[in-house]
Curated annotation (Swiss-Prot):
Record-linked SUPFAM superfamilies: Tubby C-terminal domain-like
Name of the molecule in the record: Tubby-like protein 8
Bias type Polar residues, positions: 17-28
Organism: Arabidopsis thaliana (Mouse-ear cress)
Recorded superkingdom: Eukaryota
Ranges of biased composition (kind: Basic and acidic residues): 1-16
Family: Belongs to the TUB family.
Disordered as annotated region, ranges: 1-46
Expression (tissue specificity): Mostly expressed in roots, flowers and siliques.
Length: 397
């Protein structure tokens, strides 16, 4: 009993102390309320309202527990839940502040600055001349009338349809130019005049217009004739006089044969064959000059051992353009874009069908690019391309 009395006495003493403390606090609050200005009261009310609004927003979760509210919302939930600011967001915010502060002052480094010297490499690449071709040192007459040396490789030329000069107004004129490359001057090798006699095509080839007007001129090179259907073209040399009578004999250099148009379920395309005389290959560095183009034997139809046969490559069918096309990607980057045409062709030897010996591609309405190599001469390649350009009755496309 004595212990319980002591506990009760302690409780009563504590209650008295608490009453005195609460009384003093209430008097202090009363004094504070009297000294508070109306502005402080209004601000305290506003802060309380803001706290209540934040608490109500934080209690919208399904769990009922308050969550921390920040200004960064989730991109995946559409802002329904609030996320804590990450280090990436902090970096983005800092960068945006830097960009805004430096707006209007940040500029790109100009091309002419010292730090962009590496870009200036391309400014002069197009103006520099292309390296000289291996055949560029050959004279015009040798490049035109003699077989191209074996070690020269491929020679590139352009065929251009031009306006007829005075005295040649009833036909078409084609010129043969070398394609030396960018930054180099092209050379004019030959000019050809096309006319028809009794419906048959005749081409006369010379180095200039004077040779076209007079076949006895030194610049005259030769001629090419065709049959009525245009299925066979004969390439002739300029000819020599034989015997005391002085009869003119024109050696036959090559023959071009066109087969009738081949029609398939995917379309139609042309096919051609070329016959050349066999000859020994010559090197450019040989002490002797490059040899003259050989002549076909008189019995070239029967004597097949002395002739070389070239056939045109079969074009592939393009499903997008719905026409037959040839692949000219092996030409490399020459700056000339070849258009699809039925007059385009690629000739290969029967012994080496993978290597293209002569090819022609249309560049535009009046220009064609050709590439030829041994055993062709420039004159033979020029005439074969003119035969493909010429219109024919045997070809319906």
């Amino acid at each position: 009993m004595a212990g319980s009395r002591k506990v009760n006495d302690l409780l009563e003493e504590n209650k008295g102390n608490v009453d005195t403390i609460t009384g003093s606090l209430s008097t202090q609050k009363g004094e504070d309320k009297e000294n508070v200005s109306p502005e402080k009261v209004s601000t305290s009310v506003e802060t309380r309202k803001l706290d209540r609004a934040l608490k109500s927003q934080s209690m919208k979760g399904n769990s009922g527990f308050p969550t921390e509210v920040t200004n960064f919302k989730s991109f995946s939930t559409g802002g329904r839940t609030a996320l804590k600011q990450s280090s990436l967001q902090a970096c983005m915010q800092k960068n945006s502040e830097v960009d805004k502060s430096s707006f209007g002052m940040k500029t790109w480094t100009s091309v002419d600055s010292e730090h962009s010297s590496s870009l200036k490499v391309w400014e002069f690449s197009d103006s520099e001349a292309a390296p000289a071709s291996s055949w560029s040192t050959l004279p015009n007459r040798a490049l035109l009338c003699k077989t191209l040396p074996l070690d020269v490789g491929r020679c590139t030329c352009l065929i251009v349809k031009e306006q007829s000069p005075e005295g040649l107004s009833h036909g078409s004129v084609y010129s043969l130019y070398t394609h030396e490359g960018r930054g180099r001057k092209d050379r004019k090798l030959a000019v050809a005049y096309h006319s028809r006699r009794n419906g048959k095509s005749i081409f006369r080839v010379a180095q200039n217009v004077k040779g076209l007007l007079c076949s006895s001129d030194e610049s005259y090179v030769g001629s090419m004739t065709a049959n009525l259907l245009g299925s066979k073209y004969y390439i002739w040399d300029k000819g020599v006089r034989v015997g005391s009578v002085g009869k003119m004999v024109k050696p036959l250099l090559s023959v071009v044969i066109f087969t009738p148009t081949i029609t398939t379920w995917t379309g139609s395309y042309r096919r051609m064959r070329t016959l050349l005389p066999k000859q020994q290959p010559m090197q450019k560095n040989n002490n002797k000059q490059v040899q003259q183009a050989s002549k076909l034997p008189l019995d070239w139809l029967e004597n097949k051992e002395k002739i070389q046969k070239l056939c045109s490559r079969i074009p592939h069918y393009n499903k997008i353009s719905k026409q037959h096309e040839l692949d000219f990607r092996d030409r490399g980057r020459t700056g000339l874009r070849i258009q699809s045409s039925v007059k385009n062709f690629q000739l290969t030897l029967t012994e080496t069908p993978r290597q293209t010996i002569l090819q022609m591609g249309r560049v535009d309405k009046a220009r064609y690019v050709i590439d030829f190599r041994y055993p062709f001469s420039g004159y033979q390649a020029f005439c074969i391309c003119l035969a493909s350009i010429d219109s024919k009755l045997c070809c319906t496309v």
